[in-house]
Swiss-Prot record:
Region called Disordered, residue ranges: 514-550
Segments on the Cytoplasmic face: 1-9, 157-164, 217-224, 270-337, 390-395, 445-455, 506-550
TM segment ranges: 10-30, 136-156, 165-187, 196-216, 225-245, 249-269, 338-358, 369-389, 396-416, 421-444, 456-475, 485-505
Stated name of the protein: Solute carrier family 22 member 6
Species per Swiss-Prot/TrEMBL record: Pongo abelii (Sumatran orangutan)
Membrane disposition: Multi-pass membrane protein
Catalytic activity: prostaglandin F2alpha(out) = prostaglandin F2alpha(in); prostaglandin E2(out) = prostaglandin E2(in)
Annotated gene: SLC22A6
Primary location: membrane
SUPFAM superfamilies linked to this entry: MFS general substrate transporter
Summary of the function given for this chain in its UniProt record: Involved in the renal elimination of endogenous and exogenous organic anions. Functions as organic anion exchanger when the uptake of one molecule of organic anion is coupled with an efflux of one molecule of endogenous dicarboxylic acid (glutarate, ketoglutarate, etc). Mediates the transport of prostaglandin E2 (PGE2) and prostaglandin F2-alpha (PGF2-alpha) and may be involved in their renal excretion.
Length: 550
């Protein structure tokens, strides 16, 4: 395609691509921290009721005389006796009786601060009857991510990738910092929602800006690099959270660096492909010549002119006369088909992913250890995914990742709750497959949608992912009906979604489409190739039958 030839002319993968890709993906280290930050800032330590203020523990015995026991013999977290309960005359005279009347924790709670000295749970007592508020905070963050995917995906197609990224960095820095100083839970949730919005824009535009500056043969490498940076961010979160256990300090530490990202983002070069798709040929020429100078291809850049670009990018200029809206995804049959299929893939991946990663305390092992393990499994999983993406194609990679993830989660549902090692061993490969699925779907979506609506399509796909992440915590409530019910649901959805991939075209080695006509011509070309393949196979089968005497 013409634009890919222009990229090769100005240096292909040169100094500019190396610098800009590095600077654009660097914030993703901390984006991973924000997405699962509440595993640590909202961790629930062991707790029990505080005895009445007038209770004289030294006179009335130990704390246990106020605390009923659960089935496992541990103190109840949300109930206390209305009066001290004395059992039969044991030698120490302090054996608690579990048959007395109980009441809620009207005087508050006592928390075990040995592992988590300070969380939003301990600061605002988000336990027992207020336990749902903890999950509400994460759901509101995901609502913000959903809104950000819709708003900033659309704005990026209208205003450009660079401008939206600059705005997103500033919004993340300000809202994240304000979250660290939130005086109450309501304000905390409001700023978390704003952080989610801006981080969604960063995620979308990071992928698109990088892919649009890269030649065809390097796009999969860039997508995999972005996935690895996100995985490294999970390692970073485990280490930082262990070193900084106070939630306000941790929140500030993962938010303040976005001020630096905001400052250097002014030096990014806007996508020349977006300029051409918007009909701004002068800005396209200026961007390409600037990249040529950075890549040491000054002479090749000087050969470019308005006439050369006008001849090479005639299709983009024609397309740029009108901007496509989000409604075009439903109005156009070809785009509608892509939108519905990709929406299912985005939803299933995010739904199952957050069902696993936001319940680290449910595995019965150290929360810091499981965070490291979940980050570590991404490395081999994404490497295998990269090899499959580049050798077999995007479609089989996407199908295999979702199918294997679903199977692992379904198997986990039949393992007894007390077998934490076995359950963790099944959850880890499932999480790795979902991480590989995220890696693939980002790249696959960007390659399927045409330039005129690519960012809007990415935004709508991410929107469906956020719907999955919002619904996921609600599904966990079905554990009250049957403990393994959430896992069965988390596993069934990606298995069903894996079948949808057969309805999508392969993009391996294909140029990025700029218009809907490009999509239709590519579909027609692949159909003709399949027909020719079938015609070729029929004589071969007939010949084989003749040889066998059939």
């Amino acid at each position: 395609m013409a634009f890919n030839d222009l990229l090769q002319q100005v240096g292909g993968v040169g100094r500019f691509q190396q610098i800009q890709v590095t600077l654009v993906v660097l914030p993703l280290l901390l984006m991973a921290s924000h997405n699962t930050l509440q595993n640590f800032t909202a961790a629930i330590p062991t707790h029990h009721c505080r005895p009445p203020a007038d209770a004289n523990l030294s006179k009335n015995g130990g704390l246990e005389v106020w605390l009923p026991r659960d089935r496992k013999g541990q103190p109840e977290s949300c109930l206390r006796f209305t009066s001290p309960q004395w059992g039969p005359p044991f030698p120490n005279g302090t054996e608690a009786n579990g048959t007395g009347a109980t009441e809620p924790c009207t005087d508050g709670w006592i928390y075990d601060n040995s592992t988590f000295p300070s969380t939003i749970v301990t600061e605002w007592d988000l336990v027992c009857s207020h336990r749902a508020l903890r999950q509400l905070a994460q759901s509101l963050y995901m609502v913000g991510v959903l809104l950000g995917a819709m708003v900033f995906g659309y704005l990026a197609d209208r205003l450009g990738r660079r401008k939206v990224l600059i705005l997103n960095y500033l919004q993340t820095a300000v809202s994240g910092t304000c979250t660290a100083f939130a005086p109450n839970f309501s304000i905390y949730c409001a700023f978390r929602l704003l952080s989610g919005m801006s981080l969604a824009g960063i995620s979308l535009n990071c992928m698109t800006l990088n892919v649009e500056w890269m030649p065809i043969h390097t796009r999969a490498c860039v997508g995999t690099l972005i996935g690895y940076v996100y995985s490294l961010g999970q390692f970073l979160l485990a280490g930082v959270a262990y070193a900084v256990p106070h939630w306000r300090h941790l929140q500030l530490l993962v938010s303040a660096p976005f001020f630096a990202f905001f400052i250097y983002s002014w030096f990014f070069i806007e996508s020349a492909r977006w300029h051409s798709s918007s009909g701004r040929l002068d800005l396209t020429l200026r961007a390409l010549q600037r990249v040529a100078r950075i890549n040491g291809k000054r002479e090749e850049g000087a050969k470019l002119s308005m006439e050369v670009l006008r001849a090479s990018l005639q299709k983009e200029l024609t397309m740029g006369k009108g901007q496509a809206s989000a409604m075009e995804l439903l109005r156009c049959p070809t785009l509608r088909h892509l939108f519905l299929c990709l929406s299912m893939l985005w939803f299933a991946t995010s739904f199952a992913y957050y069902g696993l990663v936001m319940d680290l305390q449910g595995f019965g092992v150290s929360i810091y250890l499981i965070q490291v393990i979940f980050g570590a499994v991404d490395l081999p999983a994404k490497l295998v995914g990269f090899l499959v993406i580049n050798s077999l194609g995007r479609r089989p990679a996407q199908m295999a990742a979702l199918l294997l993830a679903g199977i692992c989660i379904l198997l986990n549902g039949v393992i007894p709750q007390d077998q934490s090692i076995v359950r963790t061993s099944l959850a880890v490969p499932g999480k790795g497959c979902l991480a590989a699925s995220f890696n693939c779907i980002f790249l696959y979506t960007g390659e399927l949608y045409p330039t005129m609506i690519r960012q809007t399509g990415m935004g709508m796909g991410s929107t469906m992912a956020r719907v999955g992440s919002i619904v996921s915590p609600l599904v966990s409530m079905t554990a009250e009906l049957y403990p393994s019910m959430p896992l069965f649901i988390y596993g069934a959805v990606p298995v069903a979604a894996s079948a949808v991939t057969v309805l999508l075209p392969e993009t391996l080695g294909q140029p990025l489409p700029d218009t809907v006509q490009d999509l239709e011509s590519r579909k027609g070309k692949q159909t003709r190739q399949q027909q020719e393949h079938q015609k070729y196979m029929v004589p071969l089968q007939a010949s084989a039958q003749e040889k066998n005497g059939l």
